[in-house]
């Protein structure tokens, strides 16, 4: 019976300790979702890292953010934070130097991006997932087709200093929260006075998009004889290193199956139904590391199906020199209407499309239901 009473007493003590920890750390994020993470431990100092999303909100409004923190003398992360509070994160750190980065959302909310090596500040990276194409085959055995990435904004801070003085002041502030008798005893031991509560601030970090858009225009003549189009942009960056916000060395191909049609105008301002351009927009991590800016560094492959449902035309366009400055764009350059400026490529089909007979004797024209040609082709006609 005595042993049972001792066990019961021990359980009561243990439960009280757990409840006190939870009550003192009610905002601690156990990865169950977004919460403001705020905890205190003696011998640490609070550091508030401010975050400014103004350079990204016109692309997407984040609903939360994630931050990873490392000590300077270790490659292993010491903390991970997830928060609906987009304005700042509060870190409670031991004396030393620290690195951190933030990005919008959480890793699991992305469907086209996967994160790797997040335990290592210098090696952490984001990559597009591999997808299967119903019509495009890669040219090299180790190359792959990548999904178009969702919006991802990042910023980093290095060498956050937590000094001995900062820790001492924070420790004194902690003592000020103790009961009067215990507090006075501690102050007498330290021969110090109760301090004024302070907050050490860093930043703001200003996350910007590491995803770029590329607008591709394919100019054509004899547009009524075109039924559908497919495109592939080859040798783009597979991902980026998060801490340096620089592209990785690996390559992927992105396919384009959705196009808008933009007709030319005639001299009197009318619509020229025979001439125009197909416009496709590609989202990408940009150009891979080691890009030299030579034409053959990147290729745009276009495949056209004509209205006879038999004639297929193919064309390669070397564009490595044309898009050599793609990585300089991050969505912060805005036009007079406040919309982001992205680079454009204008490519011209070398000759007018052949005047073939429409299948079934119809009138021809664009058709998104193209059967075996592809399951994911869409051409949007403008309203005239």
Where do the PLM segments sit?
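Tryptophan-paired
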Residues: 64-113, 227-327, 384
């Amino acid at each position: 019976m005595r042993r049972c009473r001792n066990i019961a007493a021990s359980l009561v003590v243990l439960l009280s300790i757990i409840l006190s920890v939870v009550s003192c750390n009610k905002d601690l994020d156990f990865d169950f979702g977004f919460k403001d993470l705020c905890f205190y431990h003696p011998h640490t100092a609070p550091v508030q890292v401010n975050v400014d999303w103004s350079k990204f909100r016109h692309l997407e409004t984040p609903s939360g953010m994630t931050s990873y923190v490392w000590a300077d003398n270790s490659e292993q992360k010491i903390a991970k934070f997830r928060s609906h509070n987009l304005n700042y994160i509060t870190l409670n750190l031991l004396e030393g130097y620290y690195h951190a980065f933030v990005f919008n959302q959480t890793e699991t909310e992305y469907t086209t991006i996967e994160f790797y090596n997040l335990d290592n500040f210098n090696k952490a990276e984001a990559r597009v997932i591999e997808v299967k194409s119903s019509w495009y085959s890669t040219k090299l055995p180790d190359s792959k087709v990548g999904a178009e990435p969702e919006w991802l904004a990042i910023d980093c801070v290095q060498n956050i200093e937590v000094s001995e003085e900062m820790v001492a002041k924070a420790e004194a502030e902690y003592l000020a929260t103790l009961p009067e008798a215990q507090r006075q005893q501690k102050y007498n031991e330290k021969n110090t006075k109760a301090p004024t509560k302070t907050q050490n601030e860093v930043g703001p970090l200003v996350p910007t998009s590491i995803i770029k858009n590329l607008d591709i225009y394919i100019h054509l003549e004899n547009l009524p004889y075109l039924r559908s189009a497919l495109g592939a942009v080859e040798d783009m960056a597979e991902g980026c290193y998060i801490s340096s916000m620089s592209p990785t060395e690996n390559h992927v191909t992105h396919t384009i199956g959705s196009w808008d049609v933009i007709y030319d105008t005639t001299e009197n301002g009318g619509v020229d139904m025979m001439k125009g351009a197909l416009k496709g927009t590609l989202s990408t991590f940009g150009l891979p590391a080691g890009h030299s800016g030579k034409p053959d560094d990147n290729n745009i492959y276009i495949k056209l199906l004509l209205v006879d449902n038999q004639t297929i035309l193919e064309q390669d366009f070397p564009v490595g020199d044309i898009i050599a400055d793609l990585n300089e764009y991050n969505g912060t350059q805005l036009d007079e209407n406040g919309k982001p400026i992205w680079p454009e490529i204008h490519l011209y089909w070398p000759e007018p499309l052949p005047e073939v007979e429409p299948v079934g004797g119809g009138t021809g024209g664009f058709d998104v239901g193209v059967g075996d040609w592809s399951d994911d082709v869409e051409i949007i006609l403008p309203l005239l």
